[in-house]
Amino acid sequence: MSAKIVVEVAYALPEKQYLQRVTLQEGATVEEAIRASGLLELRTDIDLAKNKVGIYSRPTKLADVVHDGDRVEIYRPLIADPKELRRQRAEKSANK
């Protein structure tokens, strides 16, 4: 019989944070943890084909195996490109 592990799945919005604790079979993947959390049903804006995921702020793939105590994070897409914002600020400063 395979051992059980407990992981947390997190998704944060500016106004609300979701943190679900799930129990899985040892050897479960990031995707299985996310699906078991129920967040895909709660938040229709999460698309695993588009949203990046990670474990403790380190980018990972949906097929990667989770370990007991991991925190799986679902990241929202960037609203603005940081490089573009820096370029715009630099241009604005140069024009002063």
From Swiss-Prot:
UniProt cross-references to Pfam families, sorted A to Z: Ub-RnfH
InterPro entries the UniProt entry points to? Mopterin_synth/thiamin_S_b, RnfH, RnfH_sf
Q: Kindly give the SUPFAM superfamilies that the UniProt entry links to this protein.
A: MoaD/ThiS (SSF54285)
Q: Disulphide bridges in this chain?
A: none
What's this protein's family per the entry?
Belongs to the UPF0125 (RnfH) family.
Q: What is this protein called in UniProt?
A: Protein RnfH
Native organism: Citrobacter koseri (strain ATCC BAA-895 / CDC 4225-83 / SGSC4696)
Provide the organism lineage as a comma list.
Bacteria, Pseudomonadati, Pseudomonadota, Gammaproteobacteria, Enterobacterales
